[in-house]
Structures are given as C-alpha cells and as structure tokens.
Amino acid sequence: MFTLLKTEGHARRGVFETVHGTIQTPFFMNVGTAAAIKGGISSIDLADQLKCQIELCNTYHLHLRPGDKIVRQMGGLHQFMNWHKPILTDSGGFQVFSLAKLRRIKEEGVYFQSHIDGKAIFMGPEESMQIQSNLGSTIAMAFDECVENPAPLDYVKNSCARTTRWLVRCQKEMQRLNSLEGTINPHQMLFGINQGGTYDAIRVSHMQEIAQLGLDGYAIGGLAVGEPTEVMYHIIDEVEPHMPVDKPRYLMGVGTPSNIIESVARGVDMFDCVMPSRNARHGTIFTWDGILHITNAAYETDSQPLDPKCDCPVCRNHSRAYVRHLFKAKEQLAGRLAVMHNLYFYNKLMERIRQALDEGRFEEFRRTYSERLDRRI
C-alpha cells in the first residue's frame, strides 16, 4: 500500500508498504540483473553498508540461468540471495526486444532465440507472470513491448493496444497464481507499464486506459533509450497528470543524478539504472561536486577520499590515489570499491531528496544540486 505523506510542487514524499518491508519514497533500486550486483557486491553489503532499500532483478536472465524453477526450488529469490528486503523483477520484455535474436511478435507473445545458446523460447504475459511467481519477487512488472525510438505512428498505436491486452492477461494470471496453494509470495504486486514512444497523444491515452485497471503501481517505460533528455522530461510532464495519485510511479531505467532530481520534481517516486555500477567499473565516480574519472593522472598522489563529502565505507578508509592504483593494476578490488561508493552515493542522494521534501526545501535542493551533480570535474 502506498501512502502519500506530502508534496512540494509535483514532487512527492511517501511510504510504500510491502510484504517484505516498508520503503521510503522516492527511492532508487539497485540493479542486480542475475541476482547479484556486478562488481562483487553482496546482499550483506547492500543491507549493512550501502543504505539499499530494494533490489531489482531480471526475469529474462534468471529464466535462462539458473532457471526460475531452480530459484523456486531454493525458496525464491529472497532465500536464494539471502536478501530479505523488497525485490522488483522486470518482466523480461525489454531484454527480449533488445538482446534476443530472431524475435517474432504475435498476439500470444514473443518467439525468440536465447542470446546465450540460441535456444528457441516463447514468452507471453502468462509465462512472464509464472516465471516471476516462481522467483517470488515483491513486485512483478507486466510483460510489454518496448518499441524503438523513433518508430512509425501506426506501429506504436498497434503496439500499445497489444501491450494493454497483454497487461489484462498479466493481471488475470497474477491473480490466479497468487491464489494457488504453495505460491512463494501470494501477496506479489503487479505494476503496469505505460508505452507510446515519443507520441504525446498515445502516451496519454495509454496511461488513462491502464490507470483504470487498479494495479499496485504504474511505470513509464520506453524512455532513456537514446532520446534527448528534454523529450524524456516532456513525456513525463504529459503522462504524470493521468497517473493515479495513490499508487507509486516508476520511471524505468533512469538515470543520472540530475535526471533523478528533475524527475522527482515531476512526480516520480521510483528509479532504477545500471549507471552507478556500470560506470564505476570503468572508473567513473559520482561525487557531491560532480563526476570524476579516477584513472586520470591528477589523482595519482591525491590523498583525499573519492569524495571528501561522503561517509561511505570506501571514503572512510581509502584515498583516491589508492583506488586509482587498483584500477591501473587491474585489481578486482578497484571495481568493488568504486561500485560500493557509487551505490552508496545514489542511495544517499535519495535519502537527501526525502529529507529535503520532509523539510519543505526540495526546490532549494534542486537548484543547488541538479546541474552540479552531472558536471565533469
């Protein structure tokens, strides 16, 4: 259940209660694609040191390896990972349309080949729900088609209509699965996904249509896939007035610190992105003064922490010079330390956004940090 505590402009401060714990909103979901965050980050790190409230795992990848039935046999993702806070699983749709080979889209679902071994696979709304039920996640995402941007108007119209029909099937199947004896999580929630490319009218009509289904939450999908930032913000502005006020709002795959601040200002509650972990593994460090690349020669003898304004475990214990040395020496510890710092930074960013909303000074926070956090230093 989502409770809206207060607003400042369109920005929202709330509490989201789930069967696996309460989440303070707005929040960032740390991305553990294959039930692990790349960079050697364990569930113990996430819970004890990195201020993580919720993790995101990937249905497509877990279905292929180790297999959702194996995860079910192990007691579901929470037991498998030893992670006892909320987990969101995406539907697999994005990966089917971005990674899989030789896909064929039909009304019943999608036929495709595994990107791993070429094996023929079928996934439709019911199959996606069954896989996510086996995983036992807190929140399941509906199976949808994520169209390329730009795409022809007629194709996007037809795709959205099919995505709506798939969503109705997802809802029906989720209700059936949750009622079965032996279901790992009989309280599994379902979020619908708004699509429509960059066409305002399709986006709005699709959001109005799926808002009538009374789902547990709603996402804006199909953005942050190459379109200009201004276009993404415009789509959020168009769609947000039609999203239910009493349900969490999720912007999928976003983004930079500035993207998050600006999207919170537009009424978004939930975010996920591989950026903090992926960029960290290549030496890109987020700080409260901007973005630095730790392998630059300027940091060879720099005794400061990665961010002097950060109190994460890495910044409390290691210097820029040391972390730079680890990257240059190609030590595995380099990526782990950088990922730990960046994830802590993102979760701390959300904590500070929530605090600013609590204290009625979010706009001041936005003015101070929105541009600063994305600049190169």
Region locations from a protein language model:
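Non-catalytic, usually N-terminal nucleic-acid engagement modules in DNA/RNA processing proteins
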Residues: M1-I184, A297-E300
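C-terminal extensions of enzymes
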Residues: M1-V15, I23-N30, K38-G40, D144-P150, ...
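Conserved, mostly hydrophobic/aromatic
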Residues: G21, E55, D90, Q132, ...
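A non-catalytic, amphipathic alpha-helix used as a structural packing/dimerization or gating element
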Residues: E127, I131, L135, N158-R169, ...
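Generic secondary-structure signature for well-ordered alpha-helical cores
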Residues: S137, V168, K172-Q175, P241-P244, ...
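Glycine- and acidic
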Residues: N149-P152, K157, G217-L223, Q332-G335
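Glycine-rich phosphate/ribose-binding loops and adjacent secondary-structure elements
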Residues: A161-T164, E173, L177, N185-L306
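Surface-exposed helix-capping loop/turn segments at secondary-structure junctions
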Residues: E173-T183, K247, I353-F365
